[in-house]
Amino acid sequence: MAALPPGKTLQDKHYVGFSQGDALIAVMDLILDYPSPGTAMIGFFMVDISCQGRGTGTQIIAQALEALAAQGMTKARLAIDEGNPQSRAFWLKNGFVLTGERISNDIAAYLPMERPLRHGANEPN
């Protein structure tokens, strides 16, 4: 959660919690204007297991992307673990596409995904 891309500080990182009643059901971390101006980089998004498989994550992502578009962001970007087909399916369902890039480190390989943002047009597919 403390990992930062080059040129960014903790002040650039945003942590967002999503609740249902009094219960925290999802969390997201993101950095705005990275890797380029107008891009919102989603570092992670996790939904409580009790809320998975019911469309909750998709609803949250639609609302979050709409809020980002309203703030002037024009693109959302993230990177999935190459070995996580569930993550890939979730983000594809939510309008993200693979960029064709592959990023590797000592731990895993990651596949960047992106989707354009337009205020008023960020409902799930």
Question: What residues fall within each predicted segment?
Answer:
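Acetyl-CoA-dependent GNAT
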Residues: 1-50, 61-63, 67, 71, ...
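A generic structural signal for beta-strand entry/edge sites
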Residues: 37-39, 75, 108-110
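Glycine-rich acyl-CoA binding loop
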Residues: 53-58
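Conserved beta-strand-loop-alpha-helix junction that forms the acyl-donor binding cleft
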Residues: 78-88, 104-109
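Conserved acetyl-CoA-binding loop of GNAT-fold acetyltransferases
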Residues: 92-101
